[in-house]
């Protein structure tokens, strides 16, 4: 792939002739088609400027999605082909609905575990442990890598960053290095699990990669994390920060909710692997598990409070006695309400926008330039670099919508690059953007950019490891 290919890919959306189309009405060279492309570019520019405009990222893409499909509907109505446009819209909406419900259940479980103070307990243990800064650098990185395959990488990164900020005592250099490490580790950990990132979930749901096959990316993902981490750790001092003796008690049912989450994941995998039903069926069943467990917690709360009150009175524990008065009954629907609705609605807007542009035929044009006329390996590496500038969700959905004829190894490669490519820049992933806000002034875009050579080295090493270790899948 030549150096001009990225430029040609962008220009192709605007100037290439309509030699391909996914729908029977050719719109790629029409004024409607070009307007829709421009509208999507404008909407995504507003998304990228979210931090500066204080504009939720879901708003521009929701408007763009609605306008794009209305214009498609008008064009097809003029040709007397409204049912074709309706069917295409419903097909795209179904793809979104399956992913949205899946993510909603996962977010609900994460919120439930947060409510039961699991993450607070982990943070408190790390803070009071008395580790020196270099050990904490490695611990937060390893924990981010290990937690993100199960929880989403955004939650994982925020949790680990909270630990770093607690112990750093204003050490800007350590905070910057630790946050870079956390972002890389969280993104790398999410790249080899269907549950670790929205893009891996999309690939699994689309049937391009089976559940067990994702784990062939474990070593490449691990190298993506370790290479820059080793280089950055040399700059982290061995200073021991002042320990904090905070102790966090888990709320009732915390460990059982973790067990139910694992059972939910197993149910989803079994539904997909053995019954060939969408994984969302298993996830929604898992939400039912949590609903009934929440019912049990609410009904048994008075008995539990009575036992604890008697125990604390017997031990003379006034602090814990007072805390009983602030106990709030567990409410599953409250956890659903606290899901990342901005992310879910943003996901709707992106899926519908990309689906609409694909129906017009633009994705076939890009697919021709990217995969048919070029090397798929270089194309998939470029996808990862593109993910560092543009959110990997629309990039991966576009690739899945193009549906290029690729071997399993290539699908694993694009899954890897889209997942870890966002670590190249601080704005390339949700984890990076969130940590710039959480550690404002200490973890910055330019602070991250200084370590781009080390991060890029890890990116290239992970790709090389995949091409070598999984060569039989190409």
Question: Where do the PLM segments sit?
Answer:
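N-terminal secretory/membrane targeting signals
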Residues: 1-20
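Hydrophobic core segments of alpha-helical transmembrane domains in multi-pass membrane transport
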Residues: 8-13, 37-49, 64-73, 103-111, ...
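Transmembrane alpha-helix boundary signature
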Residues: 18-22, 71-91, 100, 104-124, ...
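Membrane-interfacial helix-loop connectors
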Residues: 22, 68-77, 94, 144-189, ...
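Interfacial loop-to-helix junctions that mark the boundaries of transmembrane helices
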Residues: 23-32, 52-60, 83-97, 211-220, ...
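Hydrophobic mid-bilayer segments of alpha-helices in multi-pass membrane transport proteins
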Residues: 32-44, 54-79, 96-108, 159, ...
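Transmembrane helical segments that form the transport core of multi-pass membrane transport proteins
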Residues: 59, 86, 111, 116, ...
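Juxtamembrane and boundary regions of transmembrane helices in multi-pass small-molecule transporters
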Residues: 172-176, 188, 192-193, 202-203, ...
